[in-house]
């Protein structure tokens, strides 16, 4: 049986959405939920200063939490419309930042997207932003565990 897909979106698919994807998958596997996360970037061309496949801040937090990484760690990937159609749940990490990009590029999918308010590094320190993402990821996992236990 194919897992249900949650899709995390951010601008560059380098920091916030990647952390959310990896953290969600780690927790979902532990609880055998039948859900899997993936992530994509809405505008990879807007990202600047990226070194390597994933943010060092995301890596440090994942390491501190004992979350293993798939090897090799993939590089950021752009969003295409088919992913928005096939995902069962979609989360954009910051409404103020991502709503304009979605309106411009994928307006037909707006009604399916849940918006969070997690700022990028220019507005929030990594400890704050990544803690917000962790809390955001844990809540639906707990709901899914509760549902599957019934």
What are these regions (language model features)?
Residues 1-81, 145-150:
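Conserved active-site segments centered on acidic
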Residues 87:
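An anion/phosphate-binding loop that grips the pyrophosphate of nucleotide cofactors and donors
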Residues 78-83, 102-104:
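Short, flexible, glycine/charge-rich loop motifs used to bind or transfer phosphoryl groups or to couple energy/partner
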Residues 12-14, 95-98:
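Short glycine-rich anion-binding loops that position phosphate/pyrophosphate groups of nucleotides
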Residues 96-150:
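Phosphate-binding/catalytic loops
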């Amino acid at each position: 049986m194919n897992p249900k897909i949650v899709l995390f979106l951010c601008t560059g698919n380098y920091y916030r959405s990647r952390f959310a994807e990896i953290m969600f998958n780690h927790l979902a596997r532990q609880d055998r939920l039948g859900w899997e996360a993936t992530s994509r970037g809405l505008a990879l061309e807007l990202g600047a200063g990226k070194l390597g496949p994933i943010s060092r801040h995301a890596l440090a937090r994942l390491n501190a939490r004992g979350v293993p990484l798939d090897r090799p760690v993939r590089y950021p990937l752009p969003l295409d419309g088919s992913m928005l159609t096939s995902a069962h749940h979609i989360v954009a990490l910051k409404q103020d930042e991502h709503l304009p990009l979605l309106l411009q590029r994928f307006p037909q999918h707006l009604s399916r997207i849940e918006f969070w308010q997690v700022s990028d590094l220019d507005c929030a320190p990594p400890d704050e932003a990544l803690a917000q993402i962790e809390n955001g990821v844990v809540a639906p996992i707990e709901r899914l565990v509760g549902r599957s236990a019934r």
